[in-house]
Amino acid sequence: MDAASRCDLKVFERLIRKWSPRINLVAPSTYDQTWERHILDSAQLYDFLPSTADKVIDLGSGGGLPVVVLGVLAKHRGCRIKFTAIESDARKCAFLRTAARELQINLSVITSRIEAANVEPGNVITARALAPVSKLLEFAEPLRVAGGTCLFLKGENVQNEVSEAKNSWQFEAKYYPSVTSEKSAILEIGEFYRA
């Protein structure tokens, strides 16, 4: 990670610590691990963005993990990716807008439930700590362009979630080990269809 990205992400870390006690951006038990557990965990997703990525939609963005982190990395690498955060909690949306403004990243924030969001589809859909895979695919279906990619940061139950999702969806999944937790994985799903 370059020095400019690290500097911006340290600013983001301070914003999370400042706002989180009031609006629960991250669990209080993880405040001391914000950099490793949340920011670096989100940053690893950047390397999985396809070279064709130009519009990334983040589902249930909450505290901006991973969308703000990805926006910072894209800015400092000269990538013209448009990021959209969908979040139903207006307080968290205020935080996301503050972070986007202070960090000067290309991020639009939509205050809406995911199912009701009126946004132009994207070619990458991301999510972290939001819902089981079957629900994530349900959310992603109307928001993803044909040929788009889903990148989900998942925990230790990812294999079971994928097996359960295959009861309702047809898809192939690729798993990549997390660099921040041996119990976690990055799940990549390309085309998917209702079974």
Curated annotation (Swiss-Prot):
Catalytic class of the enzyme: transferase
Binding site for S-adenosyl-L-methionine: G60, L65, I114, E115, R128
Similarity comment: Belongs to the methyltransferase superfamily. RNA methyltransferase RsmG family.
Subcellular location: Cytoplasm
UniProt keyword annotation of rRNA processing present: yes
Protein name as it appears in the record: Ribosomal RNA small subunit methyltransferase G
Function description: Specifically methylates the N7 position of guanine in position 527 of 16S rRNA.
Taxonomic placement: Bacteria, Pseudomonadati, Pseudomonadota, Alphaproteobacteria, Rhodobacterales
Name of the coding gene: rsmG
SUPFAM superfamilies noted in UniProt: S-adenosyl-L-methionine-dependent methyltransferases
Tree of life domain: Bacteria
